[in-house]
């Protein structure tokens, strides 16, 4: 089961680096450091915000508080 991560796409937590930080915390709690490192590397290589969020969603249950994206 994927850990749940909530962010606000229109607030400061919508910044992709903030989303990654929240994701890192969630995955570390489950001792999935290698998964986070892989996720981070793939996000850094992505070409858009939407692509980055799509990658992150492969690792965590990512939910926008505003119901967007």
Explain the meaning of each model-derived region.
Residues 1-69:
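Long, contiguous binding/interaction regions
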């Amino acid at each position: 089961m994927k850990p749940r991560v909530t962010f606000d796409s229109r607030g400061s937590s919508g910044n992709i680096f903030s989303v990654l930080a929240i994701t890192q915390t969630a995955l570390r709690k489950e001792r999935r450091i290698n998964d986070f490192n892989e996720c981070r590397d793939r996000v850094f290589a992505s070409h858009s915000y939407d692509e980055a969020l799509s990658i992150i969603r492969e690792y965590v249950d990512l939910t926008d508080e505003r119901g967007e994206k």
